[in-house]
Amino acid sequence: MVLDITGVEKQGIILFSESELSKEFLELIWIIVSILTTIVGVTLGVLVIVWLERKISAGIQQRIGPEYAGPLGIIQALADGIKLLLKEDVIPARGDIWLFNVGPAIVVIPVFLSYLVIPFGKHIILADLGIGVFFWIAVSSIAPLGLLMAGYGSNNKYSFLGGLRAAAQSISYEIPLALCVLSISLLSNSLSTVDIVDAQSKYGLLGWNLWRQPIGFLIFFISSLAECERLPFDPPEAEEELVAGYQTEYSGIKFGLFYVGSYLNLLVSSLFVTVLYLGGWDLSIPFLPTSNQLTWILTNGTFDIINAIIGIIITLTKAYLFLFVSIMTRWTLPRVRIDQLLDLGWKFLLPVALGNLLLTASFQILLLD
């Protein structure tokens, strides 16, 4: 007797293919939702930073600051953003239109890409790459090209000089920054941002790389401020010398991209300081149960949500503490000259960062022996 199972096989193949297609479709939807959620969250974070900076600077200068747009003026930054969107987009008549238009996008897009490898919790990360920290350094090195394009495409001497200064400054401080990241990677035996946080959480509060790499932390802090072009490291935008630097000819939404990009970069730097030196989402306070310890108490889906929320809150709290220090630095220290800035990067920070890397490597070799 011969059984005809051709129809059954076809039906099984069709059901299997449909299930695979639905699974791929759901994964695609999940990726899109995750990316959009990150973009919205980061944009809201920038609005909070702008409001905090205005309030803190007002307090330092004994002013009130924004107070009419919403409670305590909290939506003043949103109102300013809408105003920039509605402004006319002026293009220089004799400038290079293509370079002028593409420059702001090349500056902003790498900053958004940096958020892919930032962990806000144990499993809250868009892309857990094995070379996460190097990915951040690689994409951030693209931004100087956009600054040069913006300065050259404006057909303005002040813009061009500002673009040259910005590119030189970014290249100068990218190297000490990368050397500090290498030192952290040697201590953690990994280039993954998640593994770096896990390596710190093994030893609690005393395991933070802030205590194991104090010199590297100071170099990373100074270099990140210079990368973000924050005072006292903002010669590319020195008003007394270059009007507004490479932003001089920009208006409307393109100027808004530069404005948002600078704060996005500042938030990225603060988050990486948190991940690399301050233990990331790990709290590690004595006698206070952390998320890892609570896992033994609660094991249902509700705990996963609570754990994720706690991790996000801890990470953002540490990042905003670093932002507070950056804002205080901006409003209390004078601007340095461009020659002093480059000398600091090449003649002081680079040799010290190299020495710190050699000491870290020697220490790791001794441990292996």
Curated annotation (Swiss-Prot):
Instruction: Name the membrane topology term.
Output: Multi-pass membrane protein
The record ties this protein, via PROSITE patterns, to: COMPLEX1_ND1_1
User: Mind naming one GO cellular-component term on file for this protein?
Assistant: chloroplast thylakoid membrane
Looking at the UniProt entry, the stretches that span the membrane are: 29-49, 97-117, 129-149, 167-187, 205-225, 255-275, 305-325, 348-368
Report the locations given in the UniProt record. Plastid, Chloroplast thylakoid membrane
Q: Which reaction does it catalyse?
A: a plastoquinone + NADH + (n+1) H(+)(in) = a plastoquinol + NAD(+) + n H(+)(out); a plastoquinone + NADPH + (n+1) H(+)(in) = a plastoquinol + NADP(+) + n H(+)(out)
- Write out the GO MF terms: NADH dehydrogenase activity; oxidoreductase activity, acting on NAD(P)H, quinone or similar compound as acceptor; quinone binding
Q: Does the keyword Transmembrane helix apply?
A: yes
> Which top EC class is named for this enzyme in its record?
translocase
Q: Which UniProt keywords apply?
A: Chloroplast, Membrane, NAD, NADP, Plastid, Plastoquinone, Quinone, Thylakoid, Translocase, Transmembrane, Transmembrane helix
UniProt GO BP: aerobic respiration; photosynthesis, light reaction
InterPro entries (alphabetical): NADH_UbQ_OxRdtase_su1/FPO, NADH_UbQ_OxRdtase_su1_CS
Q: What is its EC number?
A: 7.1.1.-
Chief localization: plastid
Which family does the similarity line name?
Answer: Belongs to the complex I subunit 1 family.
What is its biological role?
Answer: NDH shuttles electrons from NAD(P)H:plastoquinone, via FMN and iron-sulfur (Fe-S) centers, to quinones in the photosynthetic chain and possibly in a chloroplast respiratory chain. The immediate electron acceptor for the enzyme in this species is believed to be plastoquinone. Couples the redox reaction to proton translocation, and thus conserves the redox energy in a proton gradient.
Subunit annotation:
NDH is composed of at least 16 different subunits, 5 of which are encoded in the nucleus.
This chain belongs to which protein, by name? Answer: NAD(P)H-quinone oxidoreductase subunit 1, chloroplastic
From which organism does this entry originate?
A: Angiopteris evecta (Mule's foot fern)
What gene name is listed for this protein? ndhA
